[in-house]
Structures are given as structure tokens and as C-alpha cells.
Regions:
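Conserved SAM-binding loop of SAM-dependent methyltransferases across substrates and taxa
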Residues: 79-91
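Amphipathic alpha-helical interface surfaces
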Residues: 54, 79-82, 102, 106
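S-adenosyl-L-methionine
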Residues: 1-71, 88, 96-117
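Conserved class I S-adenosyl-L-methionine
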Residues: 67-78, 94
């Protein structure tokens, strides 16, 4: 990769490693190197079925006996899987993600999940 005249030129070898955000019918994805990364809560649905959610280690660790309105802060939200499990267990969850690309992927996953309700 060379920078010239305030533009970045990609050499052929750099193009194979380049990543980009792309939106398609399945939502927003980070695509590059023949792989894609997207938030998708549908794969977590079996884990929140009745009787299974209470056995999730994260939920068990976060529960506070006698707390009727639990609130969790997910300071490393990533794609939101932990937040999803806690919300399904009845927690109010505040999510924070420092990487704007990962935050955008998580926001897209949340928006798509809310559209399925």
C-alpha cells in the first residue's frame, strides 16, 4: 500500500486482504479475505429456550438474589451475544463497544432482531 497525493493506492496483494462493510438482504457484514462477520442472534435462540437460560453460566453469575430489576453493563459488547442472553433473562442491559465497526454490526443485529418480533 502506498500513500500518494492524499490517496491510498492498494497493490494487488493488498486487495486480497482488504475488508469492507457491506449491506445485503441479511443485513450489515464485515467482508474480506473470503470471510464475513455479522451479528446474528438467531443462532442463540436454542440457548434461551425454557429451562436452558437459567443454566447459562453468564446468567447464573450475574443473578443477584432478591434483585427484582437487574441491570447489567456490558462494557465490551462485541456483537452482543452476552447482552442478548442477559436481556432474555430479564436484565436491563446497557451495551458499550469501543470499535465503531463492531458497534455498527451489533446495532444492525439488534435492529434486525427487533424487526422479527
Amino acid at each position: 500500500m502506498r500513500k500518494s497525493n492524499q490517496q491510498i493506492e492498494l497493490a494487488e496483494s493488498d486487495e486480497a486482504c482488504a475488508t469492507s462493510l457491506q449491506r445485503d438482504e441479511r443485513g450489515l457484514a464485515l467482508v474480506g479475505g473470503g470471510m464475513e462477520l455479522r451479528g446474528d442472534f438467531s443462532q442463540l435462540l436454542p440457548r434461551i429456550r425454557k429451562g436452558r437460560l437459567a443454566s447459562e453460566l453468564l446468567v447464573r453469575a450475574a443473578k443477584v438474589r432478591g434483585c427484582t430489576e437487574p441491570w447489567a453493563i456490558d462494557a465490551t459488547a462485541g456483537l452482543g451475544e452476552d447482552s442478548f442472553l442477559l436481556a432474555a433473562a430479564g436484565f436491563r442491559v446497557s451495551m458499550y463497544e469501543s470499535d465503531p465497526i463492531i458497534a455498527a454490526l451489533a446495532r444492525d443485529a439488534i435492529d434486525r432482531a427487533q424487526g422479527l418480533q
